[in-house]
Structure formats: C-alpha cells, structure tokens
C-alpha cells in the first residue's frame, strides 16, 4: 500500500483534535491489522449528495487479541500490541485511537504513552478496572473497579510525559458495566477531569441506551460546574439502536465502532471454510470471495508490477540505444 497523503507522526497526533474541532465529532472504525486498516481508511459511501468516510481508526484490545487467537484478558502484551499498531500506521494516514486496557501501573502507562505518541497515535483510552481486566461485553465476567483516586494518579502520570498537548489521554468509565450506576460514573468522571483527562468514555453492555443518555445529560452539568469539558466518547456496540447522529445530538464527540471488522471477518472465514468442505472444492466459495486482483490492488501490488514494467521498458530502450551501430563522421581527404 502506497499512502496517497502521507503524514509525519507529529502531524498525525494532531489530526484527531483537528477533526473534532472542525465538525464537532469524529467517527472511527476498528482495525486489527494492516489490511483492515487500509479498508477503514479508504471506504467511502455517497449519501444524500455527501461523501461519507471514517475519520480515524480504533486499535482494539479485543480484536487485536482475537486476531492472534488469544482472549481479551490482559494476555497479549504491550510489545505485541505496539507491533500491530505500527503495522496499521505504516499503511494508513488517518488518526488512530488505541485501546490501552487498564494502562497497567503508572510507570507502565508512562512508557506506553511515550511510545504511542512517538509512533503518531492521537489518543489512548484506559479503563478504570483492576488489572488483569476482563472484557466488558461478557456479562458473566467479574468486573472489579480500580480506586478512582489511584486511577486519577495514572491519568496524571500519562499526561505528564506527553510531548505535546495534542496527544490525548482518555478515561473509560466502567461503572455501568460493573453495576455501580450513573452516580458512581459521574463521581469518577469528576475525579478524572480534575486529574487532567482529555476525554471521558462512558461504557455500557446493555442494549437499552437510557443510562448512557442519562449520563450524557448529567455530564453537561458536571462540566459546566467544573469549568472544563473533555470530549465525550461512545462505543455503541450493544446500544446501536442509537444512530451516530443521535449520539452527536446528545453531546458525544467521538464515536467508536469498536469490533465490527474482526467480527465480520470471523463470520466470513468460518462460512467459507465450511463451504469448501461441503462443496468438495473451492469453486463453491468463489462467489463469496474477493478476486485476488482486488486484494492486489488494495495492498499496492499492482503499483509494484507497474513499476517493474516501466523499469523493464526503460532498460529495453537503453539497451537498444547501446546496441545501435556507432555513427562515424566522414573524414576529410
């Protein structure tokens, strides 16, 4: 993949804030490897005379872990995560937000923030659960929350090591996930805002969005009282009866479609594997598979072969000139 509009890491760090400042919100899509990153960056649709696309990329702990065949339970380490992050950054140019799980200890979080900012990541989101975390979408898992004052110290530690003011440290509230309720979420949000967080993500694993909307309404009053309003973040995986427009109307500034690329790929791969077995050959799978030529074009292989042909033609022309007989000037008698 040859990036059409390459950016430096420092430019890329600023890009998420710029997108939100420009239109009030940003909509980003999950990616878990280079190919899914290219798709998240490049897909566009025309709707009502407007060209729609994603404003950035979400690098998810769940889908990064699952793509490696691992559960989302703090098993895949930061070095492996950073390898995937860099893989996606190499072939894209839009801003990236990284799922930082719990962030670990403050010293570990400082290291992560420094590394992500150097790479060109725009923001990291950490959740206020005790390490090792369990994925929030599993309603049966124990979800133990970290002491809010300890978590606030972690936020401060991350903010203190940022190189620029553009890199964002965003706090993810797990109060609704744990059953602690909206009041606990607002109390934690206040502590984290006072600690300097750049954003608040309120998370829920319920299909009913009423708690999310209740929090969003109360958040306005909280920020007015504190005199500071960090961006508000939504991950509407379970309550997606609310449209992106609904979320923006309720004050959300960052909307993350957090795991759909991996889930779609998993379903498609499972089905095509079964189709080949049932059909006795891969012929029956052809209708649900992209042509190899499409994959070549997406990852930039066509560009390489085009350059190969151009260089071969240049060599042919040069060799042709070399093999031409020398023209000797006539001599005087």
Model-identified regions with their sequence ranges:
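Alpha/beta enzyme core
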Residues: 2-256, 311-330
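Extended, intrinsically disordered, low-complexity segments
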Residues: 2-10, 16, 35, 260-333
């Amino acid at each position: 993949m040859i990036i059409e509009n390459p950016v430096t890491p420092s430019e890329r760090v600023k890009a998420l804030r710029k997108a939100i400042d420009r239109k009030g919100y940003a909509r980003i899509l999950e990616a878990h490897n280079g190919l899914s990153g290219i798709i998240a960056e490049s897909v566009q649709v025309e709707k009502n005379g407007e060209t729609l696309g994603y404003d950035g990329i979400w690098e998810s702990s769940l889908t990064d872990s699952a793509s490696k065949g691992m559960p989302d339970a703090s098993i895949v380490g930061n070095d492996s995560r950073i390898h995937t992050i860099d893989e996606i950054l190499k072939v894209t140019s839009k801003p990236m937000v990284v799922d930082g799980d719990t962030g670990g200890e403050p010293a570990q979080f400082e290291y992560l923030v420094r590394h992500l900012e150097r790479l060109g990541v725009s923001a990291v989101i950490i959740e206020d659960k005790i390490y090792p975390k369990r994925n929030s979408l599993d309603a049966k898992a124990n979800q133990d929350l970290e002491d809010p004052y300890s978590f606030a110290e972690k936020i401060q530690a991350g903010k203190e090591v940022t190189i620029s003011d553009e890199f964002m440290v965003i706090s993810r509230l797990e109060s609704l996930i744990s059953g602690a309720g909206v009041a606990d979420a607002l109390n934690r949000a206040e502590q984290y805002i006072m600690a300097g967080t750049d954003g608040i993500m309120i998370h829920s694993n319920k299909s009913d969005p009423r708690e999310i909307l209740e929090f969003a309404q109360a958040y306005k009053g909280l920020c007015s009282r504190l005199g500071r309003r960090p961006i508000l973040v939504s991950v509407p995986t379970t309550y997606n009866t609310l449209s992106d427009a609904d979320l923006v109307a309720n004050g959300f500034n960052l909307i993350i479609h957090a795991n759909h690329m991996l889930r779609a790929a998993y379903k498609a791969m499972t089905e095509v594997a079964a189709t080949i077995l049932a059909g006795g050959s891969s012929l029956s799978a052809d209708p649900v598979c992209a042509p190899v030529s499409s994959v070549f074009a997406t990852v930039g292989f066509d560009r390489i072969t085009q350059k190969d042909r151009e260089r071969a033609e240049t060599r042919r022309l040069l060799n042709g000139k070399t093999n031409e007989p020398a023209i000797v000037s006539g001599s005087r008698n």
